[in-house]
Amino acid sequence: MYSNKENVNILTALLVKEKITKAVVCPGSRNSPIVHNLCACPEIECYPVTDERSAGFVALGMTLADNEPVVVCVTSGSALLNLAPAAAEAFYQKRPLIIISADRPAQWIDQQDGQTLQQHRALEPNVRKSVTLPEPHNEEERWYCNRLVNEALNAVRLNDGSPVHINVPISEPLFEYDVPKLPDERNIFMLHATTDSICVYEMAADFFRGKKLMFVLGQLTPEVVGNSLEAIEALKKVAVVIQEKLADDDIGPAQPIDEVLKMIGEDEAYHPDHLIYIGGTIVSKRLRQFLRECKCKMSIVVNGIDEFCDTFMHTTDMIQGLPEDVIGIFANETEGVKKRDFVTLWDKAFDKALAIRKTIRPRFSQMLAVKAFHEKMREEAVDGELFYGNSSAVRLGNIFSDQYIYVNRGVNGIEGSLSTAVGYAIAHQEEEDVYCVIGDLSFFYDQNALWNESLPPNLSILLLNNGGGGIFHQLPGLERSPYRDSAIAAQHTTSAEGICQTHDIVYLSARNEEELDKSLDKLFNSEEGPVLLEVFTNAEEDTQALKDYYQAF
């Protein structure tokens, strides 16, 4: 029988799946559930050592014998600090040492309770990874606990071996052993990708044996996308490839991702069974939710070195490497792979959604302003780079842009969007025009980007001003708060006209569709620069325009 502590059982189950066979265990009551489980596992041999400092080096010596990871487990408090010398030695010798410490619950740290100190990250920087496990109370916390253990156990094998620290808070009662078997935990397998990586080629071959194949491309630089265009086209012949304009350097309509997801509802025919996620963040919350609901037999995430992202909560395999390398490897494995009915199903849905999109003419709103902006760019054959602000602005760009979008999506903050566009425009002022589409809060928050002696003439700004944070009008339930507009959405009556006068920026404005059309003509044909077009809209009308748009699908 095993302990009834769920985080302890998740940890134990994954140690077994990782084929850990040796554990040095030290005495204590708080770590007794862990020690009990280790001793109860027939796959793990336990070696009791009383002195923690010695125990750490005993475990280190075991790793030298066969170069396999070894556990050393201690109780809470200063017992953990006694492992610091062994952790440091293991770090510099590159030894795979798994340090497991029991801990008191977080609420009892620094409360003059017995055997307590700040244990999280206590051994850094001399361990490769430090994690503190939650005590799970729901499925999301169970997933989080599983992910953290996987993260640590994968890190222990990095770079020929490294020590890691897994800290395990355990609440009382401690001594209940009534669980008959360990849970069947998800074990995430990690590979390192190079262009001659045989294991990654084998994984790609396994992937293409699936029936419902999907690639999701998160934010990628235009250089990476450009270098991978042929490979991406090869993938599209056999798999569904989802890419927002943050990962699409092709000139053409934006993929109607949210629109299709609205159309298909809960139809599982559209769910992939083999999924690979490459690149950075995706904008669409609807897409993230959709993919989290999919039950994939194989779910691969491509991460950078020392990254461990499990965005869709069902990762089975991870590849650490460059996106273009992995895209190229998988594209090379498409030879002889037949196009699946799954691809045809999605292609028809995309075509239908694009046809509907063409028929929609929004009311005067931010949506119309962005649509008209991109239509005018096409009419005038404008060649330039696009920068978008976050929140509502980039979501509209992902509907109407037909070219690559730059956006600060790493953290998704509203600060710095304008400054980033200014920086790019300065660096490229002799080569190309730069257009920044931005919401009012993001613009006014970052207006000092224009207080700049180097402000270049090749910068044009489309400012969407609806008197506050428009996205807060789109969040269901927030309308019930009487403080939404004044305190949450930062309602205001500010205009950019005075700012433009101060910084010698050509100022244009529009308050209706006719003014918008005329001002866009001036924006794209102005011989002076920089130039700013401020479009004034109503937040409620903006919200309704968005609702009307999605109701059409």
Where are these regions (language model features)?
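A short, small-residue-rich loop immediately preceding and capping a beta-strand
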Residues: T21-V24, E45-Y47, A65-R104, H271-G279, ...
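Active-site diphosphate/adenylate-binding microenvironment
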Residues: V8-L11, S29-R30, I34-C39, D347-E431
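Phosphate/pyrophosphate-binding active-site segments
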Residues: M1-Y2, L291-N390, R511-F553
